[in-house]
């Protein structure tokens, strides 16, 4: 197994122990048609990590709507993950008044105690260590498509919590642009206008989008900024 070198490359299959049991094949766990997000955190029972995973409990139904499976990873044991889950769920209930009550985490967490998987996937943070001096995992996010290729990777330092609403927005963009010949502009949200790919000439664009194209006039005189409604 080797780490994915960038978007478009095949994500490695692997086996792993989790708080929900043993996964004999990551590919089989994802399934044929689903997407997946593999996210690592530095350590169980720590403040930033607890806020992150509680937020993911709240957003899990949104990821499920998009056919995206979630799975976490840290170098803690499966037993530690299971005990920590009570804190995560308690914080979720405090932050999400009126939300459906969750009795268990809606995602498994990999127990990578020997750090072998995190090392292979390039998830380790050399600047973060436990009391024994062992390195810890960074806040990494891998988005993997149904074709088992890496679509996006983001690496956050331990001191910066992730914005999972942004991750959800990125999933919307990735899933749309995987099937439609458009790109998503700055601050795009699902339902907003998109841009025509620069690789598509005007004639082909007109065949695809008809009269819906709105070309924005710019000082250069180049007609490259072509907006189209969201292709539902």
Curated annotation (Swiss-Prot):
Oxidoreductase is among the record's keywords: yes
GO biological process assignments: cell redox homeostasis
Residues covered by the Thioredoxin domain: 5-176
Family annotation (PROSITE patterns): THIOREDOXIN_2 (PS51352)
The reaction(s) this protein catalyses: a hydroperoxide + [protein]-dithiol = [protein]-disulfide + an alcohol + H2O
Superkingdom of origin organism: Eukaryota
Cellular compartments per GO CC: cytosol; mitochondrion
Annotated keywords: Antioxidant, Oxidoreductase, Peroxidase, Redox-active center
Signal peptide: none
EC number(s) recorded for this UniProt protein: 1.11.1.-
Catalytic residue list: 49, 49 (cysteine sulfenic acid (-soh) intermediate)
GO molecular function, one term: peroxiredoxin activity
CDD domains for this protein: PRX_1cys
Entry function: Thiol-specific peroxidase that catalyzes the reduction of hydrogen peroxide and organic hydroperoxides to water and alcohols, respectively. Plays a role in cell protection against oxidative stress by detoxifying peroxides.
Miscellaneous comment: The active site is a conserved redox-active cysteine residue, the peroxidatic cysteine (C(P)), which makes the nucleophilic attack on the peroxide substrate. The peroxide oxidizes the C(P)-SH to cysteine sulfenic acid (C(P)-SOH), which then reacts with another cysteine residue, the resolving cysteine (C(R)), to form a disulfide bridge. The disulfide is subsequently reduced by an appropriate electron donor to complete the catalytic cycle. In this 1-Cys peroxiredoxin, no C(R) is present and C(P) instead forms a disulfide with a cysteine from another protein or with a small thiol molecule.
Family indicated by similarity: Belongs to the peroxiredoxin family. Prx6 subfamily.
PANTHER family: MCG48959-RELATED, PEROXIREDOXIN-6
Protein name (database record): 1-Cys peroxiredoxin
Organism lineage: Eukaryota, Metazoa, Ecdysozoa, Nematoda, Chromadorea
């Amino acid at each position: 197994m080797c780490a994915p070198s960038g978007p478009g490359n095949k994500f490695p299959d692997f086996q792993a122990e989790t708080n929900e049991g043993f996964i004999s094949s990551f590919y089989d766990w994802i399934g044929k048609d689903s997407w997946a997000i593999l996210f690592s955190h530095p350590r169980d029972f720590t403040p930033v990590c607890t806020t992150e995973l509680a937020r993911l409990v709240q957003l899990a139904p949104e990821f499920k709507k998009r056919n995206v499976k979630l799975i976490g990873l840290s170098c803690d044991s499966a037993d530690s993950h299971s005990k920590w889950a009570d804190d995560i769920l308690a914080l979720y209930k405090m932050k999400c008044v009126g939300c459906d009550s969750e009795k268990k985490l809606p995602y498994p967490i990999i127990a990578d105690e020997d750090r072998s998987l995190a090392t292979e996937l390039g998830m380790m943070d050399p600047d973060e260590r436990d009391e024994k001096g062992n390195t810890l995992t960074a806040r990494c996010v891998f988005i993997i498509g149904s074709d088992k290729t890496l679509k996006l990777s983001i690496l956050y330092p331990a001191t910066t919590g992730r914005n999972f609403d942004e991750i959800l927005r990125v999933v919307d963009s990735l899933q749309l642009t995987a099937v439609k010949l458009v790109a998503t502009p700055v601050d795009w949200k699902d339902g907003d206008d998109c841009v025509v790919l620069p690789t598509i000439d005007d004639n082909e664009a007109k065949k695809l989008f008809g009269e819906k194209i709105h070309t924005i006039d710019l000082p250069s005189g180049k007609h490259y900024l072509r907006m189209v409604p969201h292709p539902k």
